[in-house]
UniProtKB/Swiss-Prot annotation:
Membrane topology (UniProt): Peptidoglycan-anchor
Main location: secreted
Matches recorded under Pfam families: Gram_pos_anchor, M, YSIRK_signal
Family annotation (InterPro entries): LPXTG_anchor, M_anchor, M_repeat, SMCR, SMDRR, YSIRK_signal_dom
Ranges of biased composition (kind: Polar residues): 319-338
Source superkingdom: Bacteria
Organism, as annotated: Streptococcus pyogenes serotype M49
Pentaglycyl murein peptidoglycan amidated threonine, modified sites: T339
D repeat windows: 272-277, 278-283, 286-291, 293-298
Prodomain residues: 340-369
Protein name as catalogued: Virulence factor-related M protein
Organism lineage string: Bacteria, Bacillati, Bacillota, Bacilli, Lactobacillales
Length: 369
């Protein structure tokens, strides 16, 4: 654009120079014509020869031609001046356009710089976006791997939770069975104590009767001594029998007391063991519940905890057991724990021994289980 503007300026200067040259030439030519006309007029006045007249006519014609040429040149000069004015206007217009073009060029240069800056910024942002996309892809892969690992861990925890729930149910059933056996053992002890008290009372009555017979024996005559002797022997036999039964009852009561001590000790140990297991199970269940909650939060799932279903089943099972337990206990109270025979406060020593043995065996089985 600058080069074209320079060419236009040079053309305008050249046009101005040519126009000035034409004007100078016309001025000189007009002065020459005037001088020739004056000289020729003086010659005509001095001579009147035909030759001079012919020359005069020729010069006149030439002068007329030159004047015509001058008119043409003046007209051409005016046209050139008009062209010069038009060219000057065109020049001004072109200069204004050049200024406008310069503004446009500067604006375009500025826009070009802005575009370069925008392009550089967009390129940098594209690079950052590409790096961010790659980072997000890596994070997504890592998140998927972590999700798979968490799902596997969740399944493992669910399996462990199920096992712990089942173990807790078995432990609860064992504890309830042991409690029932202990209640049966206590009922048997009460019955043995009642029997012991009755035997003790009978023994004291027989002992008093025997002492009375011993005291009354010298008072009776000899003929009735045989009957008294028989009564005394019968009393002694009854006393021996009662004493034997009392001894057996004492032995059974001692055995029951010993078994009760063992049962209490085993019960305490088993209860402590069950309490420790229950506490460990509760802690593990709480820990697993917390881990399950974290897993559910990470998975953004609103499903219920699977571990609560076995708990609901356990509660319903406990409720059913609680509902059926009174009738079972009622039936057990009217029967012996080992033989199933009808309970009798005066049952035999063999039945008591079998009952105590059955209670001990049941306790050992519970402990082994």
């Amino acid at each position: 654009m600058a080069r074209q503007q320079t060419k236009k300026n040079y053309s305008l200067r050249k046009l101005k120079t040519g126009t000035a040259s034409v004007a100078v030439a016309l001025t000189v030519l007009g002065a020459g014509f005037a001088n020739q006309t004056e000289v020729r007029a003086e010659g005509v006045n001095a001579t009147t020869s035909l030759t001079e007249k012919a020359k005069y006519d020729a010069l006149k014609d030439e002068n007329t031609g030159l004047r015509g040429d001058q008119t043409k040149l003046v007209k051409k000069l005016e046209e050139e001046q008009e062209k010069s004015k038009n060219l000057e206007k065109e020049k001004q217009k072109l200069e204004n356009q050049a200024l406008n073009f310069q503004d446009v060029i500067e604006t375009q240069e500025k826009e070009k710089e802005d575009l370069k800056t925008t392009l550089a910024k967009a390129t940098k942002e594209n690079e950052i976006s590409e790096a961010s996309r790659k980072g997000l892809s890596r994070d997504l892969e890592a998140s998927r791997a972590a999700k798979k690992e968490l799902e596997a861990k969740h399944q493992k925890l669910e399996a462990e939770n199920k096992k712990l729930t089942e173990a807790n149910q078995v432990s609860e059933a064992s504890r309830k069975g042991l409690s029932n056996d202990l209640e049966a053992s206590r009922a048997a002890k009460k019955e043995l104590e009642a029997k012991y008290q009755k035997l003790e009372t009978d023994h004291q009555a027989l002992e008093a009767k025997h002492q009375k017979l011993e005291a009354d024996l010298p008072k009776f005559q000899r003929p009735s001594r045989k009957g008294l002797s028989r009564d005394l022997e019968a009393s002694r036999e009854a006393n021996k029998k009662v004493t034997s039964e009392l001894t057996q009852a004492k032995a059974q009561l001692s055995a029951l007391e010993e078994s009760k001590k063992l049962s209490e000790k085993e019960k305490a140990e088993l209860q402590a063991k069950l309490d420790a297991q229950g506490k460990a199970l509760k802690e593990q269940l709480a820990k697993q519940t917390e881990e399950l909650a974290k897993l559910r939060a990470e998975k953004a799932a609103g499903s219920k905890t699977p571990a609560t279903k076995p708990a609901n089943k356990e509660r319903s099972g406990r409720a059913a057991q609680t509902a059926t337990r009174p009738s079972q206990n009622k039936g057990m109270r009217s029967q012996l724990p080992s033989t199933g025979e009808a309970a009798n406060p005066f049952f035999t020593a063999a039945a008591a021994t079998v009952m105590v043995s059955a209670g001990m065996l049941a306790l050992k089985r519970k402990e082994e289980n």
